[in-house]
């Protein structure tokens, strides 16, 4: 159903990404107790923390872009997950984009990642730590076959399934977005232990990484959570609908004007940028 829409969505995302956003002018976190504000795709954060760039279990990619900030809950999740992976001898976790120092809208690449509760993690676990040059210009491993319906068998491994499962089993995680072909492979690999699959949601792109989203933290009273995923493992008709051809007469998505910022985020911009 959705294969032909992927390129269109990518074009829309890039078209809306040409203009810089005022959030990029904020170079340091806003002081105060940690507060995620607004929705994942329209919000900001006060009291963000920088993910430590030196760690045993993970490495941070593209540090020159300074997208390694998030709510303390997100920093702690990354540390928990990478410690689990390291203790199991699975390899090094590769951390991609989190958020900017005050969150807010990016000028490209993401619609969400605005409240300090989202992180992209590569779906590869190198046994040898990457060099500085590799981290600055990372080579993503496209796990999805050219037909868009299956993973590439030679690139898939049980460790990738285990990495996603470990993340999904974390109580703070509400959703993990992966390509539909990757979700399908997880459904095949899961066996009888399937409860965690409910959190793994098929979505456009996401061929080489998973996008992990946490719940709104306790105390972040202006944070807007999503409704829980539908009951079940998500491996049935819903998943298969992603592989169906588009219906006759279907039209490409229309680029939407971003909604107004939450008042607290607008006030933050007014004070620190505008």
From Swiss-Prot:
Function: Murein endopeptidase that cleaves the D-alanyl-meso-2,6-diamino-pimelyl amide bond that connects peptidoglycan strands. Likely plays a role in the removal of murein from the sacculus.
Assembly mode: Dimer.
EC number: 3.4.24.-
Molecular function terms, GO-annotated: metal ion binding; metalloendopeptidase activity; serine-type endopeptidase activity
Lineage per the UniProt record: Bacteria, Pseudomonadati, Pseudomonadota, Gammaproteobacteria, Enterobacterales
Bound cofactor: record note: Binds 2 Zn(2+) ions per subunit. Zn(2+) ion 1 is bound in the active site. Zn(2+) ion 2 is bound at the dimer interface by residues from both subunits.
Pro residues composition-biased segments: 245-263
Record-linked HAMAP family: MepA (MF_01623)
NCBIfam families associated with the record: PRK09429.1
Highest taxon in the source lineage: Bacteria
Stretch list, region Disordered: 224-263
InterPro entries: Hedgehog_sig/DD-Pept_Zn-bd_sf (IPR009045), Peptidase_M74 (IPR005073)
Compartment(s) where it occurs, according to its Swiss-Prot or TrEMBL record: Periplasm
Major localisation: periplasm
Cofactor annotation: Zn(2+)
Cleavable signal peptide: 1-19
Protein name: Penicillin-insensitive murein endopeptidase
């Amino acid at each position: 159903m959705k294969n032909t829409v992927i390129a269109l969505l990518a074009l829309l995302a890039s078209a809306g990404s040409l203009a810089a956003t005022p959030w990029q002018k904020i170079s340091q976190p806003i002081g105060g107790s940690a507060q995620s504000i607004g929705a994942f795709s329209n919000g900001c954060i006060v009291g963000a923390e920088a993910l430590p760039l030196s760690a045993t279990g993970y490495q941070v990619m593209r540090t020159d872009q300074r997208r390694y900030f998030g709510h303390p809950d997100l920093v702690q999740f990354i540390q928990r997950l990478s410690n689990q992976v390291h203790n199991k001898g699975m390899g090094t976790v590769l951390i991609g984009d989190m958020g900017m120092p005050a969150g807010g809208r990016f000028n490209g690449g993401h619609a969400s990642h605005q409240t300090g509760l989202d992180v992209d993690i590569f779906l590869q676990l190198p046994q040898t730590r990457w060099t500085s040059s590799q981290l600055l210009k990372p080579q993503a491993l496209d796990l999805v076959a050219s037909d868009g319906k299956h993973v590439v068998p030679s690139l898939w491994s049980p460790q990738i399934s285990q990495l996603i499962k470990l993340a999904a089993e974390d109580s703070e995680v509400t959703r993990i977005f992966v390509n539909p072909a990757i979700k399908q492979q997880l459904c095949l690999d899961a066996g009888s232990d399937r409860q965690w699959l409910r959190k793994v949601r098929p979505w456009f792109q996401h061929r080489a990484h998973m996008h992990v989203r946490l719940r709104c933290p306790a105390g972040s009273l202006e944070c807007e959570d999503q409704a829980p995923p539908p009951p079940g493992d998500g491996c049935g008709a819903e998943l298969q609908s992603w592989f169906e051809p588009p219906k006759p007469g279907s039209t490409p998505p229309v680029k939407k004007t971003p909604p107004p910022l939450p008042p607290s985020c607008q006030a933050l911009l007014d004070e620190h940028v505008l």
